[in-house]
Amino acid sequence: MLLSKDVMSPVPDLLKRITIDANRMHGRPCIRGLRVTVADILGLLSAGQSRETILQEYPYLEAADIDAVLAFAARQADHPIIAAE
């Protein structure tokens, strides 16, 4: 399941948690304006870290932040690429 059981908000509301600011973290997508990037959390998840461990190591993050990271990544991966002819 993409969303945690305690999150009832639809994906567009989750995506509001992802911020992009050219003056923060070189414009990379961050969580709620914090200095934690989407790539940071994706890297931890892909390395096998559990959501619970990530939330313990980053106590200022919420379960919905991890849901937002996954929703953002899914949207980014779904962008079509059109080849130039």
Residue ranges and their predicted role:
Residues 1-85:
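Small, basic N-terminal interaction modules of short regulatory proteins
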